[in-house]
From Swiss-Prot:
Family the UniProt entry places it in: Belongs to the arthropod phospholipase D family. Class II subfamily.
Residues annotated to bind Mg(2+): E25, D27, D85
The organism's taxonomic lineage, starting at the top: Eukaryota, Metazoa, Ecdysozoa, Arthropoda, Chelicerata
InterPro entries, per the entry: PLC-like_Pdiesterase_TIM-brl
GO CC field: extracellular region
SUPFAM superfamilies in the cross-refs: PLC-like phosphodiesterases
Reaction catalyzed: an N-(acyl)-sphingosylphosphocholine = an N-(acyl)-sphingosyl-1,3-cyclic phosphate + choline; an N-(acyl)-sphingosylphosphoethanolamine = an N-(acyl)-sphingosyl-1,3-cyclic phosphate + ethanolamine; a 1-acyl-sn-glycero-3-phosphocholine = a 1-acyl-sn-glycero-2,3-cyclic phosphate + choline; a 1-acyl-sn-glycero-3-phosphoethanolamine = a 1-acyl-sn-glycero-2,3-cyclic phosphate + ethanolamine
Tissue specificity remark: Expressed by the venom gland.
Cysteine-cysteine disulfides: C45-C51, C47-C190
Protein name (record): Dermonecrotic toxin LspaSicTox-alphaII1
Amino acid sequence: WIMGHMVNAIWQIDQFMDLGVNSIEFDINFDKSANPIYTYHGVPCDCFRSCLKWEYFGDFLTALRHRTTPGDKLYKEKLILFVFDMKTNSLYDNQAYTAGVNMANNIFKYYWNNGNNGGRSYFILSIPNLNHYNLIKGFQETIKSKGHPELLEKVGYDFSANDDIPDVEKAYQKVGVTGHVWQSDGITNCLPRTLTRVQAAVKERDSGGVINKVYYWTADKYSTTRDALDAGVDGIMTNYPYVLNDVLKENAYKNKFRLANYEDNPWVTFKP
């Protein structure tokens, strides 16, 4: 999965698709009542990027629906995975459940078209705080209450704060999550980071733990990209998708890796 990083404006969805991604990540900001209001990163953000692009959340979800509904004139067949990078650190811990309810209501209405032939993409709810595990519960219970539990087959989870893996697993246990788990690891492209924790996450994935997939962010250099692939990640988030596409054509990688497509279940751990 090539994950386009910080795609917060509608026009950037098409820009990143043209650059060769099959997945995009965007930032969700909440108001004081835990309502998701707009896609926006703000300052500081990655080096060499503009941090100030934004859209209203409902408009952005509608744009995503058009691009992932077969038969729509804006349809992009290769766009198969989203990462909702939810900026919940602005909320109190006891608002996490409400944030999950509000995320579910918005996604159900604007992306899933109220359960009527909505967008087909899979997506990851990425949470930056282990104490906000109840967001998952709020999301799941809201979708079930609408009579559409099958839509949860399209939803996965990630805690994105680089916490210790056992602590991450405990947070999932509290809300009964046993699958659909991606583990992220990384840092802004301005700073170097070792792959020690990525390797720990990959080991946990391959030992049959709760983690199904691992992604690394933000890899913009050829060397970092190769190191992440060598560590065995399933996805790489990048500002420059051509770098990863170039590396995947190199002799060392072209027979080991390929771009994921819609038939590849993002919740199933890959077994070579």
